[in-house]
Design a protein with these regions (language model features):
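N-terminal helix-cap/turn-to-beta initiation motif at the start of protein domains
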Residues: 1-14, 25
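Contiguous, well-ordered beta-strand patches that form the walls/edges
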Residues: 15-24, 30-87
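Short acidic DE-rich linear segments
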Residues: 91-93
């Protein structure tokens, strides 16, 4: 998967609504979504205004529009609902 040179997504992004859910983007185009004790790994491509995420085991990838401002990540989900995540530093493996 391709990686933008200035990858602003790298790090741990915790859901503001559900603090036990977080996107964890690694600098190598890999990552995982954590939810409680579980996690689902994915590969991603940062397209600057959108991110394409392909969860391991899923048939197709999904593309989500996003913006980042002041350590807040806003992702538009498949239902066109904006979901808010707060940057929490480095990825916790």
């Amino acid at each position: 998967m391709g990686i933008a040179m200035d990858n602003r997504l790298v790090g741990r992004w915790e859901s503001v609504q559900l603090s036990f859910c977080a996107y964890n983007f690694l600098p190598d185009g890999e990552g995982f979504y954590s939810f409680g004790e579980g996690k689902k790994e994915f590969a991603y491509t940062d397209n600057i205004e959108s991110v394409t995420i392909h969860f391991n085991g899923d048939f197709m990838a999904s593309t989500f529009r996003y913006t980042i401002e002041d350590d807040v990540l806003l992702i538009e989900d498949n239902f066109k609902t904006t979901v808010k995540y707060k940057k929490q530093g480095e990825v916790l493996l």
